[in-house]
């Protein structure tokens, strides 16, 4: 069981709502993934109609919604988006995203830390999306973040765990849950992230852009479960030398 703030999750696969070809396909894929937390950008919601085709079905499903501040270019804009989400969605949970560079979507560490402190002081449950920077993740813990979400590789790139060395350090040092976010492109990569000791992974593009998102969602669900089970079972030590599994010379003395 994964616990973030006061909320418990059976599934350690978190998902997103972007890039699906239709709202119905998105909902079916999320159901197939068995995910219990879904992130969505406030800028994508149609708040004027009073009945958004994405929001309403998700609310009715009972899945935990994690509004994100994607599109915010600085701390001020991110705080505004979070406060809007709290008012409209009646939740104090927020995935903090600040990426002023529209080409590579790299998160701004300085603005993110400033916004995180402000939001934590305002009573938000903050899950910041950041570079895989162990020092920054410690600072975010110190200001009160409920979890940290270091990137595996650039958003939507499907490059996998390009930051593995730093993810290991973050996982080792963290006293809050570590959710590996962005860049996970295959179920095997999700398994590996969980084998490292990550508490959860967030996957969107790899599911939504696949030929069969529903089947891919099931694959990721199974992959995350397998990776977590392997981590709990205790992985064997890696050695540069061969280690025999049975005696090599004992039979000569018989």
UniProtKB/Swiss-Prot annotation:
Keyword hit for Cytoplasm: yes
Record keywords: Cytoplasm, Schiff base, Thiamine biosynthesis, Transferase
Transmembrane annotation, as ranges: none
Full protein name: Thiazole synthase
Organism of provenance: Shewanella sediminis (strain HAW-EB3)
Function field: Catalyzes the rearrangement of 1-deoxy-D-xylulose 5-phosphate (DXP) to produce the thiazole phosphate moiety of thiamine. Sulfur is provided by the thiocarboxylate moiety of the carrier protein ThiS. In vitro, sulfur can be provided by H(2)S.
Oligomer and partners: Homotetramer. Forms heterodimers with either ThiH or ThiS.
Entry annotation: catalytic residues: 95 (schiff-base intermediate with dxp)
HAMAP family: ThiG (MF_00443)
